[in-house]
Amino acid sequence: MNQVLTETRPIRLKGRSFLAMVLSPELPLDGWLELLDDLARRSSGFFLGRPVVLDMENLAIERAQLVYLLQALNDRGVWIMGVEGARPSLLGPGMPPAMRGGQPAADFEAPAGEPQANPGAPEPQISQAVRAPGHAVHAMPSMVITEPVRSGQSVYFPEGDVTIVGSVASGAEVVAGGSIHIYGTLRGRALAGTAGNTSARIFCRKLEAELVAIDGLYKTAEDLEPRFRGQAVQLWLDGDYMMIDTLS
């Protein structure tokens, strides 16, 4: 019997860029967690299966408070894949790893356009961590989906506009760096302008959305005026306010 000697194959290490949410907690933590609970209640499944990075850069807390926060998020089904901006003494065994070099794009922050129960309370801030372009892009690329987006499916295209020739089902999600055009019913979530594009818009033939967001400003189904539901509409930003109007 002949013995065949083979060379050990080297381990191949590759670099890839992935899309993740970034949560920026604020003090007091219990108050911020209540706001997070409200967001999760108004948009069911928003954090389900999402990798999330915790932004600690502007949060002055001690390790015990961080442990409490991580446990509270875990209890809510929010999976923290890493911590950014935390001083080394805060992190320890059993905690998510420290992350560096994140390039946040647009913040998902509730607009101040409509009165809230407590208008002085800060809203939880969420952002999309994406690869930022190195130079200004004048002609944004686009993606066209020629079939409906079904429940549980997600369409991510941070480079430009997304057009859906069909409907977006409840529990589905469309995320675009530019505008979103839906030639059907929007029942799920549509997040436009995630690359910091304040001129992005959302268009749909029939509005039944769970959540809409443009450049960080979001509205849930409860925030949308009833007279716009079931209508063909467009949404856009005017400063820090999200505007909505019917399509003629």
Swiss-Prot record:
Domain of life of the organism encoding this protein: Bacteria
Query: What is the designated name of this protein?
Result: Probable septum site-determining protein MinC
Alphabetized InterPro entries for the sequence = CAP/MinC_C, MinC, MinC_C_sf, Septum_form_inhib_MinC_C
* Function according to Swiss-Prot or TrEMBL: Cell division inhibitor that blocks the formation of polar Z ring septums. Rapidly oscillates between the poles of the cell to destabilize FtsZ filaments that have formed before they mature into polar Z rings. Prevents FtsZ polymerization.
Quote the Pfam families the UniProt record gives.
MinC_C (PF03775)
Q: Which UniProt keywords apply?
A: Cell cycle, Cell division, Septation
Species for this entry: Brucella suis biovar 1 (strain 1330)
Which family does the entry's similarity section mention?
A: Belongs to the MinC family.
Subunit structure of this chain's protein: Interacts with MinD and FtsZ.
